[in-house]
């Protein structure tokens, strides 16, 4: 029987059993009875609804004004084309938005690998069939790719650019899509044993992604999102005892935390510290181009940093007035 919360068991074993680069089974044990379902359900919901990623959100097709059109020489109608585009797994490594093109003449089979990329994009499933063209078929498309979180609903989703609302225009076909790179998640809770105790939980999470992120990274990001949402409860205070607290409260508490809390890889963390980036507030004020000038910090590390910041609703290039607070580090 416990008398203090720090006497409760915490997980000691974390196993990652990779079935493929994009499919894995994560095992966490031992957990106090009931915590398997508590953590498993929370992580599953976050993985399915709140993961950052990239997707095609708009298509402009030559000769097509609306999604109920057909294209001469193309076996699929426009609705089917848009459905196929939703399945393209595309990764943005630079920026939050990009335009790519697709230009093909028949007879041929058009695949995701035929999409003409610019700098900073990668197609993970180039074998995906988008359309089939006969000898009269011609397909010219301009596609808009965006980064985001969760599900993109064209009816309810309104983007703001320079304080102007981006409205749907004729010829630009909006695509309902999910930014989440996670395709399937399931969790199971089994019994675990530690010495004479047999009433413990073992949590197993089975996870499959679309390939733009590996399963282990997806679990790490989802846990970081959950941690951030619970942070307010951990640091809950009812009275301000110091005048410095007012200055600190002008900033999001996350910005005042060490970059170590981002749980970056050792390489990325060391690169940031070498540039005297010790707090998250220091990091978010840097731009992508500034970080890429950092010795030993490449595009892979930059993408990792952007994904972790996005999971906390932060981004690079932010402007923070009166940073740093005088009391930072006390």
From Swiss-Prot:
GO BP annotation list: DNA-templated transcription
**Region feature Alpha C-terminal domain (alpha-CTD), mapped onto this chain:** 251-330
EC number, as in UniProt: 2.7.7.6
Gene3D superfamilies reported in the protein's UniProt record? 5' to 3' exonuclease, C-terminal subdomain, DNA-directed RNA polymerase, insert domain, RNA polymerase, RBP11-like subunit
Q: Which reaction does it catalyse?
A: RNA(n) + a ribonucleoside 5'-triphosphate = RNA(n+1) + diphosphate
Signal peptide span: none
- List keywords of the entry alphabetically: DNA-directed RNA polymerase, Nucleotidyltransferase, Transcription, Transferase
The Gene Ontology CC terms held by the record are:
cytoplasm; DNA-directed RNA polymerase complex
Task: Tell me if Transferase is a UniProt keyword of this record.
Answer: yes
Asked if the record carries the keyword Nucleotidyltransferase, the reply is: yes
**GO MF, any single term:** protein dimerization activity
Q: Where is this region: Alpha N-terminal domain (alpha-NTD)?
A: 1-237
Name the InterPro entries for this protein.
Answer: DNA-dir_RNA_pol_insert (IPR011262), DNA-dir_RNA_pol_RpoA/D/Rpb3 (IPR011263), DNA-dir_RpoA (IPR011773), RBP11-like (IPR036603), RNAP_asu_C (IPR011260), RNApol_insert_sf (IPR036643)
Per the record, the similarity remark reads: Belongs to the RNA polymerase alpha chain family.
HAMAP family from the xrefs? Answer: RNApol_bact_RpoA
Q: What does UniProt say about this protein's domains?
A: The N-terminal domain is essential for RNAP assembly and basal transcription, whereas the C-terminal domain is involved in interaction with transcriptional regulators and with upstream promoter elements.
Functional note: DNA-dependent RNA polymerase catalyzes the transcription of DNA into RNA using the four ribonucleoside triphosphates as substrates.
The record's subunit annotation is: Homodimer. The RNAP catalytic core consists of 2 alpha, 1 beta, 1 beta' and 1 omega subunit. When a sigma factor is associated with the core the holoenzyme is formed, which can initiate transcription.
What name goes with this protein? DNA-directed RNA polymerase subunit alpha
**Biological source species:** Legionella pneumophila (strain Paris)
The top of its lineage is:
Bacteria, Pseudomonadati, Pseudomonadota, Gammaproteobacteria, Legionellales
């Amino acid at each position: 029987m416990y008398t203090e919360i720090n006497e409760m068991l915490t997980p000691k074993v974390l196993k990652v059993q990779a079935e493929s680069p994009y499919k894995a089974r994560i095992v966490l044990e031992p957990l106090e009875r009931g915590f398997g379902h508590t953590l498993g359900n929370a992580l599953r919901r976050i993985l399915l609804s709140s993961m950052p990623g990239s997707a095609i959100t708009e298509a402009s097709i030559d000769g097509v004004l609306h999604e109920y059109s057909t294209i001469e020489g193309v076996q699929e109608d426009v609705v089917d084309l848009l459905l196929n585009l939703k399945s393209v797994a595309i990764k943005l490594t630079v920026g939050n938005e990009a335009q790519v093109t697709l230009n093909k003449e028949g007879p041929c089979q058009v695949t995701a690998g035929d999409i003409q990329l610019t700098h900073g994009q990668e197609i993970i499933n180039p074998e995906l069939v988008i359309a089939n063209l006969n000898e009269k078929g011609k397909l010219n498309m301009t596609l808009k790719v965006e980064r985001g979180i969760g599900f993109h609903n064209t009816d309810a989703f309104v983007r703001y650019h320079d304080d102007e609302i981006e409205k749907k225009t004729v010829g630009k076909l909006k695509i309902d899509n999910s930014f989440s790179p996670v395709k399937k998640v399931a969790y199971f809770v089994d019994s675990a044993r530690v010495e004479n105790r047999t009433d413990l939980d073992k949590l197993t999470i089975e996870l499959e992604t679309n390939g733009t992120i590996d399963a282990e990274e997806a679990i790490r990001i989802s846990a970081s999102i959950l941690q951030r949402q619970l942070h307010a409860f951990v640091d809950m205070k009812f009275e301000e005892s110091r005048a410095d607290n007012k200055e600190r409260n002008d900033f999001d508490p996350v910005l005042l935390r060490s970059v170590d809390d981002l749980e970056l890889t050792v390489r990325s963390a060391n690169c940031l510290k070498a540039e005297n980036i010790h707090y998250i507030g220091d990091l978010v004020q840097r731009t992508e181009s500034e970080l890429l000038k950092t010795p030993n910090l490449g595009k892979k590390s930059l993408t990792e940093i952007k994904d972790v910041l996005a999971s906390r609703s932060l981004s690079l290039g932010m402007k923070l007035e009166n940073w740093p607070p005088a009391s930072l580090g006390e």
